[in-house]
Amino acid sequence: MKEQKRISESLITESLTNDMFWVCLENEDPILGYVSGRIRHSFIHILVKISVSCYDSTRTRRRIIYRLRNKDSND
């Protein structure tokens, strides 16, 4: 059976080494996020979508699955 995941929009506040980021969620403490797939750039203060596993007991690490485009940016 495929694992159910919750996806939420978040903000990256700090870029760390090894494609890790501090991510602020809307009503939670900052968590450590890691990138998936082709999202391997050091962006700071960008909006992202986060995937949350139901089996993550610590809820401290989440997977960044998508970078949302800002309306005022040129990319």
From Swiss-Prot:
The keyword Transmembrane helix does not apply. GO terms for cellular component: chloroplast. The keyword rRNA-binding applies. Its main location: plastid. SUPFAM superfamilies: Nucleic acid-binding proteins. Keywords: Chloroplast, Initiation factor, Plastid, Protein biosynthesis, RNA-binding, rRNA-binding. It is found in: Plastid, Chloroplast. Component of the 30S ribosomal translation pre-initiation complex which assembles on the 30S ribosome in the order IF-2 and IF-3, IF-1 and N-formylmethionyl-tRNA(fMet); mRNA recruitment can occur at any time during PIC assembly. One of the essential components for the initiation of protein synthesis. Stabilizes the binding of IF-2 and IF-3 on the 30S subunit to which N-formylmethionyl-tRNA(fMet) subsequently binds. Helps modulate mRNA selection, yielding the 30S pre-initiation complex (PIC). Upon addition of the 50S ribosomal subunit IF-1, IF-2 and IF-3 are released leaving the mature 70S translation initiation complex. Belongs to the IF-1 family. This is Translation initiation factor IF-1, chloroplastic. The gene is infA.
